[in-house]
Amino acid sequence: MIDSKKLIEELKERGLMSSLSGDLYEVFSKPTTFYVGTDPTGDSLHVGHLLAFTTAKLLQKYGHRPIVLVGGFTAKIGDPSFRDTSRPLITDEQVLHNSECIKAQVSKLIDFNSDTENKAIMLNNDEWMGKMNLSDYMKNVAKLTTVNYMMAKESVKKRLNREGEGISLCEFLYMTAQGYDFLHLYKEYGCRCEIGGQDQYGNCTIGLEFIRKALGKSDACALTWPLVTRADGTKFGKSSNGKNIWLSAEKTSPFEFYQFWVNQSDEDSEAFIKKFTLIPLDEIEQMIAKHRENPSARYLQKELAKYMTCLVHSEEEYNKAIEATDILFGKGTTEQLATIDESSLLAAMDGVAKVEVSRDMFTSGTSVIDLANMHDKVPSKSEARKLIKSNGFSINKEKVTNEKDVVDASKLIQGKYLLLQKGRKDYTLVIAK
């Protein structure tokens, strides 16, 4: 037997429970198979997807078996849930490629490889939905629901009520495909629970309806978690300049990923370390208490960023991110700056001014006065001279003390970058092409 009461209390304390249908206490009182869906329309997940797999990992820790269901078939339809417009459709080849990429990422979050009975499996709903013809659909799926039931769903009503929009029949039928997924997994894999975000609650419950009508069973359940927002009401999952934070190192560097977490507010860090990590709750309370003693040290943010970066990338990438942070924003030296990889440098400089110049100007050398004048906050050469005389200007972390100095190509980081620094925090990145 599994202590389902303890599990559900932990879900609540971590903020991982929003809506519930069915008897969750009974379903999770013994080892149970559950499923979580993922969308293969892209080749990488982003941080907005992490909560699904945090929840799945927690359930797996208690002895339950996860099915990660790739929506290969439904991706070719488009989910209308709380979207203002339809999704673009994708090809079978794209679905296959994206599914492989997603599995590689998810494998870091939940266990697919152990010898335990509850190791995760990954399935693609195209395996059963893709084989179904119209006659099969009418007999096996369409008869299990009514138009009235579907019209009452909030996601459908929102699209229908938007002037000039409407909803295609293809998208309208999406929820029946998701409902049939639950029915199929219930019959073939003994799956008794679907988990998802709050915006998926309507689609989750139609699966329960299908199981009840097709099999006369009412022992399945659905569990959803609240949508994640920041304390200030802004959307979670994007950087300060509005970019998605991806799990793929090619799309978002580990340095930028680390910075995303370490820059969270105190209030958000307290919530996110409960939601996104499996650090025991009593330890988290101790960490929060320690953080509150000296919030300016950002202890909690650093611990959250460490956990998430090690989880999604690796301890090695975490150490590189820490080193890059110390070099760029701490007391790094010119020699240390030269060791930073290009992706970390560009990620760190993402929000600063950039100046593109010809590499030829460094062949015979460029004066430090001219370089200082390239800085975003140095409007003239006279200001550049004053800045240098006051020891307020650095190139590649090295103070410039002689206004007659010149800089040649040997000083370029990675053969093409110069980091201009005014004071302690004002940077401009020179890119030589």
Predicted regions and their residues:
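Conserved nucleotide- and phosphate/pyrophosphate-binding catalytic cores
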Residues: 210-433
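NTP-dependent nucleotidyl-transfer catalytic core
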Residues: 1-200, 205-208, 215-221
